[in-house]
C-alpha cells in the first residue's frame, strides 16, 4: 500500500506544470502521465500548445513532457549568452529528475533539435520521431526565411509575424479553421526574438546532415504529402540514411502534420511506440 507521502508524489508526477531555472534561463514545461518519458518539441514560432492532441492522448500510457523553447511561448527570452536548444532540453530533463533514455517527438525545428540531441546524447535517447523535420546542415532550395527576417528588421515583428502566418508552409493548415486559429494564436503570442537576433541552433555545429548515418536510436520519419518540397526531400533523405528508420507519408496533409491530421498521426505514432523494444 502506498503511503500518504508516496500518494502525493505520484499525484504531482501525473500532472505538473511550471518553470525551471536551467542553463541560465527560465523554461516553461508541462508533465502529464506516468511511464516511459515521451518528450514533445515544438516548431519555430509555435509553442507547447501545438501538441495538445498528442500530449493528452499519450499521457494515458507515457510520462508526457512538453516545453516552450527558449524565446518561445512562456519561456524567457534569450540574452547574450551562447546556448543550444538540445543542451537546454537535456538540462530541463535532468532538473525534472528524468535520467533514463527518452523518446523525442519533434516537429520541423523540433525535429532538428531531436536529431542534435540524439547525436550528442545517444545514451539518453531511446527513440526519435521526426515530423516534417528540418536537419541542421541541409541547405534549403525554396524554403528561405531571409526575406522574413529582413521584414522584421525593416517593418517590425508584428508585420513579419503576419507575413509568416501567410507563408505557403501553412497553406494546407489555413484551410482548416480550428487549426488555422490555433496556429495564429501561437504565432501572435510568439515573442519574435529570433526574427531579429541570433538563432540558437547556429551556436553549435554538430554536422547533423553529414552524420545521419551515425544515429543509432530507432527512428520514425513522418511527413505530409502536401508539405513543401524541401521538407519532403529532407524527410526522404532522413528515412533513407538513418539506419532502420521507418517512413510514413500522411495523405492530404501539409506541414503541421500532428495538428492537421491528428487521428492518423496518433495512430502512426502509437504503432511506432508499440514496436519499440522494452528495456
Language-model regions: role of each:
Residues 245-279:
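Catalytic active-site module of serine/aspartate enzymes centered on a nucleophile-bearing elbow/loop
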Residues 195-240:
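Conserved serine/cysteine hydrolase catalytic core
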Residues 115-120, 125-156:
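Flexible "cap/lid" loop of the alpha/beta hydrolase fold
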Residues 32, 53-56, 65-105, 267:
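Active-site loop/oxyanion-hole signature of alpha/beta-hydrolase fold enzymes
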Residues 139-141, 154-213:
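Conserved alpha/beta-hydrolase catalytic His-Asp/Glu region
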Residues 35, 43-46, 108:
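Active-site glycine-rich loops that stabilize anionic/oxyanionic intermediates
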Residues 43-53, 64:
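Serine-hydrolase catalytic-loop signature spanning alpha/beta hydrolases and amidase-signature enzymes
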Residues 106-110, 114:
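Gly/Ala-rich beta-loop-alpha elbow adjacent to hydrolase catalytic centers
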Amino acid at each position: 500500500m502506498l503511503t500518504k507521502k508516496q500518494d502525493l508524489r505520484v499525484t504531482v508526477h501525473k500532472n505538473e506544470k511550471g518553470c525551471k531555472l536551467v542553463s541560465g534561463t527560465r523554461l516553461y514545461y508541462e508533465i502529464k502521465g506516468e511511464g516511459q518519458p515521451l518528450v514533445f518539441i515544438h516548431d519555430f514560432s509555435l509553442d507547447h500548445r501545438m501538441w495538445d492532441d498528442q500530449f493528452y492522448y499519450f499521457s494515458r500510457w507515457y510520462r508526457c513532457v512538453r516545453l516552450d523553447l527558449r524565446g518561445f511561448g512562456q519561456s524567457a527570452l534569450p540574452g547574450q549568452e551562447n546556448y543550444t536548444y538540445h543542451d537546454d532540453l537535456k538540462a530541463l530533463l535532468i532538473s525534472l529528475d528524468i535520467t533514463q533514455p527518452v523518446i523525442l517527438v519533434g516537429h520541423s525545428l523540433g525535429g532538428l533539435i531531436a536529431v542534435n540531441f540524439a547525436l550528442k546524447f545517444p545514451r539518453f535517447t531511446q527513440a526519435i520521431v521526426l515530423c516534417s523535420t528540418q536537419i541542421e546542415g541541409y541547405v534549403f532550395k525554396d524554403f528561405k526565411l531571409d526575406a522574413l527576417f529582413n521584414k522584421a528588421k525593416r517593418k517590425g515583428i508584428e508585420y513579419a509575424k503576419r507575413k509568416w502566418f501567410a507563408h505557403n508552409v501553412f497553406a494546407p493548415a489555413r484551410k482548416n479553421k480550428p487549426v488555422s486559429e490555433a496556429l495564429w494564436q501561437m504565432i501572435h503570442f510568439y515573442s519574435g526574438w529570433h526574427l531579429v537576433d541570433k538563432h540558437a541552433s547556429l551556436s553549435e555545429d554538430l554536422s547533423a546532415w553529414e552524420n545521419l548515418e551515425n544515429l543509432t536510436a530507432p527512428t520514425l520519419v513522418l511527413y505530409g504529402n502536401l508539405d513543401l518540397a524541401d521538407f519532403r526531400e529532407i524527410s526522404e533523405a532522413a528515412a533513407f540514411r538513418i539506419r532502420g528508420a521507418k517512413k510514413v507519408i500522411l495523405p492530404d496533409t501539409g506541414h503541421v502534420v500532428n495538428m492537421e491530421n491528428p487521428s492518423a498521426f496518433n495512430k502512426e505514432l502509437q504503432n511506432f511506440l508499440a514496436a519499440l523494444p522494452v528495456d
